[in-house]
Amino acid sequence: MKLATKKIKTLGKSKPDLSKKKPAKDAIRKTKPQTTSETKVTPRNPKQKVAEPVKNGKTTKKGFKKSHKEELEGLKDIDPEFYDFLKNNDKKLLDFNLLDTDDDDDEEGDEEDKEDTVTKESKDDEDDEEKYHKPSKDLEVASDESDFEVDEEDDAAAGGIQKITLNLLHQWEQQLGQANISIDIVRKVIQAFNSALASISADGADGGENKHNAAAFKVVGAAAFNGVIQLCVIHLQPAIIRLLGVRPNSSLPLHKHKKWVKVRGCLRYYLTDLIRLVEQVSSPNILGVLLKHLHQMAGMVVPFSALGKTILKRLVVLWSTGDETVRVLAFLCILKITRKQQATMLNHVLKAMYLAYVRNSKFVSPNTLPGINFMRRSLVEMFALDLNVSYQHVFLYIRQLAIHLRNAVILKKKDSFQAVYNWQFINSLRLWADLLGASANKPQLQPLIYPLVTIATGVIRLIPTAQYFPLRFHCLQTLISLAKETNTYVPVLPLIVEVLKSNTFNRKHSAVSMKPVQFTCVLRLNKGQLAENGFRDEVIEQVCGLLLEYLAHESTSLAFSDLVVPTVMAIKTYLKECRNANYARKLKQLLEKIQESARFIEQQRGKSSVTFDIKDAQAVAAWEQQLRLKRTPLDVYYASWLKTHETKKRRQAAHTDEINADYDVPKLKKLPVKTGVPVRNENGEVELFPSDSEDEGDDGLHLGSDDDDDEDVQEEEEVEVEHPKAKKAKKEKPEKQKPRPATVEDDYDEAGGAVDIVKDLDLNEW
């Protein structure tokens, strides 16, 4: 116990010894620079407390290393062999400079830590006072005018990259307009164009083959970008023409000039960038400008076959899916590029354009129909460039149509029928019929007329029901156009007259449609449309129009009077059973013109001028040509009908109120909202059928002479039924003034009705 207490006492005595070191630490703290009274002294972290002993230790270690270095230096004189051994086996031991450098770095690090500690406390006041950043009052705002200024500092910082400014572009424009053009300025402009594309690319870098040129210039801002594009589009092509020394009337290709080698490489890069820009642009206006420029550069695409295929591929896409103006410009570019290298490019272009035509003619609507018609006409022009090359394609594609038709006839399944009864098939028939008609004076494609006529006739007879009457009329129109253009007899009259014998057509309609049915963009009708009166009206219009068009063309034939005998008999048979006065009137008028033309032909044949043999084809053709100059009665009637029909078609496409009036469509007046108060006129009398029309004497029905008597009777009955309803409105609010009894004569005058309740009917609302 005594020993234990002694140990405890000794431990207790050791405490004052430790406390003696505190004044030394306080003395060290006092040596630090004093801060202002406003600053707050922050306590030291643990790392700062152990900084001084470490420093002392490093100082001792440095002296030890210094003495060790001297000993090793002395070893070189005392034992050279051992020194060489260390030098060969342990070089680090003798690397005194490396050791000294590490020590110096440690010392410098300690000094920097010490200085940071001092400056940190001295800047506490500034951190508190300037806690928030205060911007300068002399800041400058960037604007588009900075594009005119050359920023030399940016150029130096960018490592030689020159910034495109409007002043620089103006200098280039002047250099491009000079008579003697340097190849260097052309290369600079093309490099600037590449840099402009790199500035708008998705990843911000140039994705083309001219990637190294993009580092030469830097395009910043919309003004600089537009300036570069405008410079290339307007001034580059004329400058290259002057550089090559092309004469105005020279027929020598551009790639055969002497200086072509100098511009070949940069032009290849430029055309690549140009078509890449065309792919990225979606604005029709900008596309139009770029395509016009590409049309000027078409002669420079010839030497680059691979690049030419890429350009044509993109142009075909624009030709088939772009805006109307873009379509036309794309086709002009395709035509110009293809004609300059027709031997190598025509096959690829024809195949690509036909596939694009079929792909984009799958659906036909009033909006897509003009584009499809343009593609068909332009594609006919492309096939007509070389009929020998086109024959292989036309024969192959007509054969594909025949295979689809054969499968439908043999299999008789829904899928096989749908492969034939679709817009792609019908538009293909139209395309080949137009092509054969356009090349009628050349013998290369004439053997394909008979297969095409056979296919079209087979399509009509595949499903001869009333639901597919629109498709039948489309095929008949194609055959009639082919017969007129090729001057070939095609037996379409039986296919037209057959429609009049349809039970569905002759059945009385069970539904009334105010809006007429149009077959222009329709191939098939549903059961509801078959029951409407608009279906029968359109069928009669189509039958009369097709008969008139075909017979007007054949009216100058030597055998016309014999040709129309079956048709005349079929029309007379239908007129005996027809109950609709409108249909009977139209067919009677057509029948009279047919018979009049037949008598005219018989008179011409009975004259003494016909002295040739019927087997003499040339004499028959000459006689028919003279007859065309005299104009047959049916031909004159068809010309007047066609003029009226085309006018109605153009107005129908416009969808205006004036068109509806010209179409004799009745209009409906919208009655005011019923508020329980009867509408009175100026005399205080109740109006049974109020109207907004100011002209009370105008006939608003516009029904004309085409209306049936039965329909007129029904309208009178409807008017008589509505009179009691108007009298009920009179009883709701009694007045002292007794209204005069309403009669039918009050609302309808001798002209047929001054007040019209169906005057403002808009077809778009139904």
Swiss-Prot record:
The modification Phosphoserine is found at residues 143, 146, 691, 693, 705. It comes from Drosophila melanogaster (Fruit fly). The gene is Noc2. This is Nucleolar complex protein 2. Belongs to the NOC2 family. GO terms for biological process: negative regulation of transcription by RNA polymerase II; ribosomal large subunit biogenesis. One of its GO terms (molecular function) is histone binding. Residues 1-12, 58-67 have a biased composition (Basic residues). Residues 14-29, 130-140, 757-766 have a biased composition (Basic and acidic residues). Its main location: nucleus. It is found in: Nucleus. One of its GO terms (cellular component) is Noc1p-Noc2p complex.
